[in-house]
Amino acid sequence: MNFNKKTIEDVQVKGKKVLVRCDFNVPLKDGVITDENRLNGAMPTIKYLVDNGAKVILCSHMGKPKGEAKPEFSLAPVAKRLSEMLGKEVVFAADDNVVGENAKKAVAEMKDGDVVLLQNTRYRKEETKNGEELSKELASLAEMFVNDAFGTAHRAHCSTVGVTEYLKPAVCGYLIQKELKFLGDAVETPERPFVAILGGAKVSDKINVINNLLEKVDTLIIGGGMAYTFLKAQGYTVGSSLVEEDKVEYAKEMLAKAEEKGVKLLLPVDHRVAKEFKDVEAVVTEDQNIAEGFMGLDIGPKTEAIYAEAIKDAKTVIWNGPMGVFEFENFNKGTIAVAKAMAEADATTIIGGGDSAAAVNILGFGDKMSHISTGGGASLEFLEGKVLPGIAALNDK
């Protein structure tokens, strides 16, 4: 996949109607946005276009309304908040069919530097099927397309891929440009030693990531629930910990592949365990083995030290997935230790979206990282070496 894409700075935007696909899939409570990270992420691109006299038409999905106009998925609160953040009115085109009379009228009346937000693209069933009709309707509003929604770049939808068939040039905004720079450099030309840290509950979610990263990294660190499947593959006892029995063979293959490639594969050497899946006081094991009746819920202190040491020596670090049950105060220590080691590392540090991003932000280490990806699923597919349709559809430099 070519990561060298045209950006908003490579095209003339003044006086042009520009359709911008943003990621405004934000959490709402009683009509109020509870996490503005994604709105903040979209600001540099929107501001650049406004300041350079473009007519800015924003579009996004939110949640899963499944092709119905459900009011709880309306982007009206987003338009209101964007108006406050930009210090100028963002006109909301409240069409249940997304590109309707309101949208057409609002766009026709735009002056340079004006901003319009369309209704939730997933109000239309064909959005997620990459249907021709909606793609054409979206394209008909504008003279060029900007994709700045990395979070949906792994989806071939009307507003990410279909629209580019009918609307050229198609370029990336600052957010996607930054994602491509950090993730692209890491998987293509990392500064070494290159360390990847994978956590989270399931091996099955990360099969292709493990396989692909073993071709690229110097050290692979595994924590979280998926570590127990690997430990079982090595012959350790894991008590009643989460194990994917059908992935034990696969874990054996990956351990062999790491050895063959000369990759250090680090697994926990001790654990924090409990008798049930609850936030109770942790028992720390002596070694890799977990006794009958206990389940591993976090990595142990010896493991923390080993992982922190590997991170400290690295020049590039990518992390995806917590080391334990981060929601439980007694079992968030491993995740905190990894976040802290990354914050202190003299390296390019990349957080691959999802739970790790939330953890790093909650712990207050966000500004210490080189890059926090805005796409959980998209960054995982990127690390799998897959082509992301939303990126592939943009014009190369």
Curated annotation (Swiss-Prot):
Enzyme Commission identifier(s): 2.7.2.3
Subcellular location: Cytoplasm
Class of enzymatic activity (EC top level): transferase
Pathway connected to this protein: Carbohydrate degradation; glycolysis; pyruvate from D-glyceraldehyde 3-phosphate: step 2/5
GO biological processes: gluconeogenesis; glycolytic process
HAMAP family: Phosphoglyc_kinase
Family the entry assigns: Belongs to the phosphoglycerate kinase family.
Protein name: Phosphoglycerate kinase
Organism encoding this protein: Clostridium perfringens (strain 13 / Type A)
Name of encoding gene: pgk
